[in-house]
């Protein structure tokens, strides 16, 4: 519950920067990961785990692509 609280506040108050959006989405994924680990079955948990890894990698690719092709683009500073 704490990860969801932190991620929602980070998403609301720091939405101008791409890196903070990606971090807040990772915290949301972590809170869902912890919540669903008790609820879902084994195969659905494996599917959700694969989805979370793929979304994390795609988020990093988007951030690196923005920094490479568009300059800083509010990614870091």
From Swiss-Prot:
What's the protein name?
Answer: NADH-ubiquinone oxidoreductase chain 4L
The GO terms describing molecular function are: NADH dehydrogenase (ubiquinone) activity
Q: Which family does it belong to?
A: Belongs to the complex I subunit 4L family.
BP GO terms, sorted: mitochondrial electron transport, NADH to ubiquinone
| Consequence of substituting residue 70 to L | In strain: CB4855
* This protein's GO CC annotations: mitochondrial membrane; respiratory chain complex I
As for subcellular location, the record says: Mitochondrion membrane
Q: What range does the record give for the signal peptide?
A: none
Q: Which residues cross the membrane?
A: 15-37, 44-64
Reactions it catalyzes = a ubiquinone + NADH + 5 H(+)(in) = a ubiquinol + NAD(+) + 4 H(+)(out)
Q: According to the UniProt record, what class of enzyme is this? A: translocase
Membrane topology category: Multi-pass membrane protein
Organism of origin is Caenorhabditis elegans
> What role does this protein play?
Core subunit of the mitochondrial membrane respiratory chain NADH dehydrogenase (Complex I) that is believed to belong to the minimal assembly required for catalysis. Complex I functions in the transfer of electrons from NADH to the respiratory chain. The immediate electron acceptor for the enzyme is believed to be ubiquinone.
The record's keywords, sorted A to Z, are: Electron transport, Membrane, Mitochondrion, NAD, Respiratory chain, Translocase, Transmembrane, Transmembrane helix, Transport, Ubiquinone
Q: What is its EC number?
A: 7.1.1.2
Does Cell cycle show up as a keyword for this record? no
């Amino acid at each position: 519950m704490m990860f969801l609280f932190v991620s929602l506040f980070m998403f609301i108050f720091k939405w101008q920067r791409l890196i903070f959006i990606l971090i807040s989405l990772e915290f949301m994924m972590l809170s869902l990961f912890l919540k669903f680990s008790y609820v879902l079955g084994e195969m659905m948990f494996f599917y959700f785990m694969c989805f979370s890894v793929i979304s994390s990698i795609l988020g990093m690719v988007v951030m690196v692509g923005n920094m490479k092709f568009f300059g800083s683009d509010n990614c870091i500073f």
